Amino acid sequence: MKPIISPSILSANFAYLANDIEMINGSEAGWVHIDIMDGVFVPNISFGFPVLKYVAKLAEKPLDVHLMIVQPEKFIPEVKALGARIMNVHYEACPHLHRVVQQIREAGMLPAVTINPATPVAMLRDIINDVYMVLVMSVNPGFGGQKFITYTLDKVCLLYTSPSPRD
């Protein structure tokens, strides 16, 4: 399994967003990671679909859209229409996670699931083989520049070494 680098544009300088996207285009990065926050699921608000649309026009790499929002399933059509390849939703935001994962797949995107630092990896047992990837948050979601939570590395190692029927 080859690691995929997916730089987030969350910390980009929006006055120079096109330059930052160009830098990612010319890099070894595999994807462009876009964090969308609603101020409800997480305590901060980032950018919304107009910025996603702008990034989609400029990016030459697949878009990895990470929705830190309540009811992400409502936005599957918009995320798909704006060109996302991967749609990433939080385990904690989806009471019907299996349904949401299936809807993402049916829309033609790769479903991904994110867990917050305090969420046990075991919570993904029933869904792990239905998702393209798992994102383990190494900070509490909602703000950039936080201190890395070291115990999240154990979660990554556990996921990496767990047997999967897809391997």
What are the functions of these language-model segments?
Residues R85-V156:
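Conserved anion-binding
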Residues I5-S8, V32-I34, L63-L67, M87-V89, ...:
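Hydrophobic faces of well-ordered beta-strands that scaffold small-molecule active sites
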Residues Y160-D167:
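Conserved small/polar residues in nucleotide/adenosyl-binding loops
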Residues M1-P77, A81-L82, C94, L124-D130, ...:
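Conserved N-terminal beta1-alpha1 strand-loop-helix module at the mouth
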Residues V42, V51, P141, G145-F148, ...:
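Short, flexible micro-motifs
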